[in-house]
């Protein structure tokens, strides 16, 4: 043994394992006897032999532990190392992304489609309020109820199918040919476990409802056949029979009681639940039809008579079942009507502005909300221009547009044209002679040159994914926090708030005009049936508001031309009148007859000036007005000096 070469720790371990197996073979019979003598029949001879087998040697244990230590160190190093998609967190020239750009949602919370509005719990109340003002809220409510009916009906049908399967499995007879050693104990234990649970016991007591008399008789006979089998099992296994004797003796009584209960019970709970589910489906379908589709409905949806008959046929099916898709076609028609007639107006209404204000003031504004909303992107581009980083935004917009066009064509695009467009972006932002260099490193530039742009067949749609990801992260981590705390962001919010107030002011005046016409507020507008009449009434109300709008408007004097101060309607002294030398009170608040009133309010004059600008005609008109004012002032002074001279002569 000393001269034998050391086989190594692994071989030593396997040899000791083989010795343990030999000992297991030789100690099979004695270990079985020992297990019987200590009254432990549950422990097999094989498990007892494995307990006596020798373990690995200390050399093998040390070798295995060394391997485990090295594996744990490598695993720890792998965990500490950043994944392949996790690039460096520093920004450098343009920054690195720690996000997967492909997974970024190209959706903005500030711009929504109709489907997104109907499925968003935040903006949906604003849309319902808008439709209520137009008296079209029944379209939205029908779509929501039909969508809820569609989803809940399928879930109820699945529940009904599961209950049917459970009922059929519980009604299966017990086979009398189950002959194995421990048959009595599992059967009785499962029966007791099912009877211990209240719901299972109730189901078992009433499981045979709907089965004919022959099936009930066969089930009773099958249950009764268990008792001789249990006697045989007790003869083979005395210990197991002792533990389950009481349960096996009660088996025939329980089966008879179950059979009698099944005969006496009027209905099964499973069938009752299934029946209630199907009745609830029918009730919901009838309620929706009565509220929105029936000709007698208060506000029916705009569908044809043929479509109404088709919905009736799907609700009252030949098999007695309601089709879950009975309202799908009507949903599509209502959806297209809302999208074509109302949704564009909703996006321009103060209701959607209120929703945008709620999103912008929620504290969770993301970069996608800004980049995919035109109004927010306008203010963001101004901020990026002030920060001398507008080239990053322009690159992102151009590259994203480049990638979206070939992707929309699903591979059917001109490779040469795509390569020319990609070269324009490369020459502008990536090359060493770039006109607007963004600071991409050599790795990114070589990747775009060799692998993406110079590819046979043209560049792939995702050729600018890496620089797009870097530009996205730079804007998100560096510039987005500054924009959200800048004055331009608050100006954007202020503009939204002013637009909401203006729209509410117009809506309030229109409602007052409708009430003043003599009709009650709940009735439709008098000109609701005539679109031209309604439009003319709205125009009249808006003109009336604009005439008095200069009283409430706040004008920044610094933004106006100082010469416009001479264009005031009442440019006299800040007095109501004066007393002459003769003691006569002369009113100055009355306009002079030779001075013409300026047409339009301050708001209209400001709008004219903003539209016309500093043109030659405007300057000439302003000069004539100033000259007239000077002449009138001289004439007034001459008239004031004339009574004094006459009194001196006297």
From Swiss-Prot:
Signal peptide: none annotated. It is found in: Mitochondrion; Membrane; Cytoplasm. Residues 1-16 form a transit peptide. One of its GO terms (biological process) is protein localization. Residues 113-356, 366-493 form the RGS domain. InterPro entries: AKAP10_AKB_dom, Cell_Polariz_PKAAnc, RGS, RGS_sf, RGS_subdomain_2. It comes from the Eukaryota. RII-alpha binding site, predicted to form an amphipathic helix, could participate in protein-protein interactions with a complementary surface on the R-subunit dimer. This is A-kinase anchor protein 10, mitochondrial. The lineage of its organism: Eukaryota, Metazoa, Chordata, Craniata, Vertebrata. The gene is AKAP10.
